[in-house]
Every structure is written in C-alpha cells, then in structure tokens.
Amino acid sequence: MSVTDGRQAFPAPAKLNLDLRITGRREDGYHNIESIFCLIDLQDTVYLKPRDDGKIILHNPVDGMPQEADLSYRAASLLQKYARTPTGVEIWLDKKIPTGAGLGGGSSDAATVLLVLNRWWQCGLTQRQLIDSGAALGADVPFFIFGKNAFARGIGDRLDEMDIPKQWYVIVKPPVHVSTAKIFTHEGLTRNSASSIMPTFQNLQPFRNDMQAVVFKEYPEVWKAYSELSRYGFALMTGSGACVFTACQDRNSAYNIYRQVSDLYEAYLAEGLSKHPLLSV
C-alpha cells in the first residue's frame, strides 16, 4: 500500500446485502439472519502509522463522537492486548462510504484495522479468531475479515464463500438516517423466515430484505428512493437502510441509470468485487 509521511494507506470496501432474511430472535436479544454479502469497490481508505509509546490516536473521529467510541479505535484497542511488543498506532479515516446507509463503512474500517494490526503487531491471530473478535465490535465486521463474497448465518459470523456473478450496482442514498435498533425492535418486523436448505445465488432468488417493509413504513424517504430506482429495474434495500440499489450486468447500463438518479439523490456507481483488496497484498 502507498506510504505518505510515514502513514500507510489500506482499503476498506463497502458491502451490499443482496438478500437478507431474519430467521429468529436469540435469547441474548440479537437476531439470527441469513444474507448474501457482496463486496463492492466503493471504499474508505484507512491510514495507519505505528507508534512506539503504546498510544492509540484517531485523528479525525466523527463529529461529536469521542474517539473511544469509534469502531476503528475500538478495533485497535481490542487487538492491542494480543501484541507481542508495546506498540500503538495513529489512525486517519478518509470516508467515502456514507454513514447510516447499510453499506458497512464503519465495520469495514474496523476490519481493516484488525487485519493490518494483526500483522504489524505480530499478534498471530487466525482468521477465525479475528472473526470472533470482530463480532464483538459489530455484526458486519466478520464478513469484511472473511474477505470474500459470502452467505452469512447466525448474527453474521457464520460465513461460507458464495459465487456471485460479476455485476455493477447503482446505489441511492436518501436524505435520512435509519436507526438499526429501532428497526430490529419494531413489532412489525418479520422474524420467522424459513432457513435456506441449499443457499446458492440462483436458489435464493427472488431476493428480498425482511427489514425493508418496516423501514419503508417508518422512513418514507427510503420508500421514495426505492420507488424511483424501481423505475429502472429490480431494486432492494441493503442492510437496515437507508441505501437502496439495483444491479446491472454491465457498466454502461448502470451508468445510464446512475446519470438519471444522481440528479435527484446522492448516488454511487460501484462494481462488485470477488474478494477484499487486502487479500491481494
């Protein structure tokens, strides 16, 4: 990765949930899900610089949030206890993934910090150990550590690689922030979808998102964005929202849709990835 003023830059890609079903509520209050997770090339950049004094410093936390509450800071703090030498790190986040969007930006940043510092600090954690550690930070973190398109079960921590056709995506971000906690506690949320017997990309179609109906009811702006995007093809919400997306087989088709919707909404044109960029490093 590139080096600037002693800082090294590492990618943190976004994700889309191409299908998301809630199969039950757990005794601990969390929900069991089944979902297709797909990596896309919309990404943040995480800049890291080693320190030898044991301090962890996040230089640009989200406005109003103490650095200790940021997932990237928490990831570094969590991993520090496994380090073989007393070392610290400075963190800068160049955010391109919108927040509160269902694209996993904060979780991806945290996963990138875990993956890089596991090597830098010679922690020696296996991928499974990193996934288990990442699950304590957020439900999407395990997927980004797994690093490949996947079918997820449990709370998102049981992952199996899934082949997903090469696609382009048009993503629309309505002007609203969806509260994930509000959606998961909503009395109208579907929580009893049947578990998949043979989960493949083809077998799970037509895709759906069990949270979509509740979000549309509580956040009309998401419904409006979905309705607009549905004019051009099959649209779906990712995660708990607020972003909605449609898939295309080629870039030209996606770009034509992007040109139309970007006049009305914050919009993104993204290409699907087969694996996390850090797996190539």
From Swiss-Prot:
The active site is at residues 15, 140. It is an enzyme of class 2 (transferase). Pathway: Isoprenoid biosynthesis; isopentenyl diphosphate biosynthesis via DXP pathway; isopentenyl diphosphate from 1-deoxy-D-xylulose 5-phosphate: step 3/6. One of its GO terms (biological process) is isopentenyl diphosphate biosynthetic process, methylerythritol 4-phosphate pathway. It holds the Pfam family GHMP_kinases_C. The keyword GTP-binding does not apply. ATP binds at residues 98-108. It catalyses: 4-CDP-2-C-methyl-D-erythritol + ATP = 4-CDP-2-C-methyl-D-erythritol 2-phosphate + ADP + H(+). Keywords: ATP-binding, Isoprene biosynthesis, Kinase, Nucleotide-binding, Transferase. PANTHER family: 4-DIPHOSPHOCYTIDYL-2-C-METHYL-D-ERYTHRITOL KINASE, CHLOROPLASTIC. Catalyzes the phosphorylation of the position 2 hydroxy group of 4-diphosphocytidyl-2C-methyl-D-erythritol. This is 4-diphosphocytidyl-2-C-methyl-D-erythritol kinase. The gene is ispE.
